[in-house]
Amino acid sequence: MQKILFVCTANIFRSRFSEEVYNHLAIRLNLSSRAYSAGLMVGHYKTRTIYAPALEQLELLNIVPKRKDELSIHINDLDLGQFDQVICMDKNEHQPMVRKNKNLINLDIEYWDIVDEPLVSRNIS
């Protein structure tokens, strides 16, 4: 089974949303692939569960989240060797964080351009 890791800053919005949508579609289409998610700065934010606007959007898509009440996961807490593909949601935001993390130096990462808008504030989330 192919394993994909979506990565954002806090693992409460973009990466969690991507994980839920991907897995919903993979199950529906009977694909041998699953998504997971993690954050680069988990612990710097108050909220550790999926962000309310992400839940609202999932509901609009008729997707029931599988990890709704689970806490966010820091990328350093995962065995990164188990993933076939690692995707950071926003190159401009995440590439500097990746470069500062010694655990990610040799990791092959694909960068997307999904900006955190509105920017999730640390004191809100």
Predicted region positions:
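Conserved active-site segments centered on acidic
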Residues: 1-81
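Short glycine-rich anion-binding loops that position phosphate/pyrophosphate groups of nucleotides
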Residues: 10-12, 91-94
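Hydrophobic alpha-helical segments
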Residues: 22-25, 53, 90, 98, ...
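Active-site loop/turn elements of alpha/beta-hydrolase fold enzymes
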Residues: 40, 91, 114
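Short, charged/polar "capping" segments at the starts of alpha-helices
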Residues: 44-45, 92-97
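Conserved acidic residues
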Residues: 84
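Phosphate-binding/catalytic loops
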Residues: 95-125
